[in-house]
Amino acid sequence: MNLILLGPPGAGKGTQAQRLERTRGMVQLSTGDMLRALVRSGSPLGQRADAIMKAGQLVPDEVMIEMISDRIEQPDCAKGFILDGFPRTVVQAEALDRMLAEKGLRLDHVIEMVVDDAALTERITGRFTCAKCGTGYHDTFKRPAQDGVCDVCGSTEFTRRADDNAETVGKRLEAYHRQTAPILPYYADRGVLKKVDGMADIAEVARQIEAIIAG
């Protein structure tokens, strides 16, 4: 089973990918993580990618495809993969399809985690964490029982991520919609695009994804 999970930062892609790794033995393939590992490997392809990135240029599609091709041939991908961060253009999507076809593989589903931008912004900007034990809270959805005191450890110190602000979240959402807009029709035309409610709770999103996979 080979999937692409689409969704903006904060939609819960990582949570669902980790669950699929745990329950189905699939492997999450983040192109960012793969590029860093490729550069560390010192292979000819890694050296080429490193030189390109150090020059401030985008890594060419053919390098990305070769990197993904090599990665999915590893034994841990035998039960399938979940691709994250690629493709972002129709040209990349077409190249990915060709590469998979040459291996006798295909994408079974492209799952879009659909979110409401305003609601997602509220979800992200309201997050805060106990500075001592790391327990997560939310201004609206999960406040401590006693204001200013952690339910778990009693600490009175809390932190917020610097980038969990409305301006930064808005820019992330804008970038996501701009990047994914071209490839949604491509996968819809091929009958593999499915949608789940990314604003539902984690268990419900998982149920919807499992229903898609079960077919």
Swiss-Prot record:
Chain sites annotated for binding ATP: G10, A11, G12, K13, G14, T15, R127, A200
Gene Ontology MF terms: adenylate kinase activity; ATP binding; zinc ion binding
Location of the region described as LID in the Swiss-Prot/TrEMBL record: 126-164
Chain residue ranges for the region called NMP: 30-59
Entry keyword annotation includes Ion transport: no
Intracellular or extracellular location(s): Cytoplasm
Major localization class: cytoplasm
Catalytic activity, reaction form: AMP + ATP = 2 ADP
Keyword terms of this UniProt record: ATP-binding, Cytoplasm, Kinase, Metal-binding, Nucleotide biosynthesis, Nucleotide-binding, Transferase, Zinc
Subunit text: Monomer.
Domain text: Consists of three domains, a large central CORE domain and two small peripheral domains, NMPbind and LID, which undergo movements during catalysis. The LID domain closes over the site of phosphoryl transfer upon ATP binding. Assembling and dissambling the active center during each catalytic cycle provides an effective means to prevent ATP hydrolysis. Some bacteria have evolved a zinc-coordinating structure that stabilizes the LID domain.
Protein name per its UniProtKB record: Adenylate kinase
Organism in which the protein naturally occurs: Rhodospirillum centenum (strain ATCC 51521 / SW)
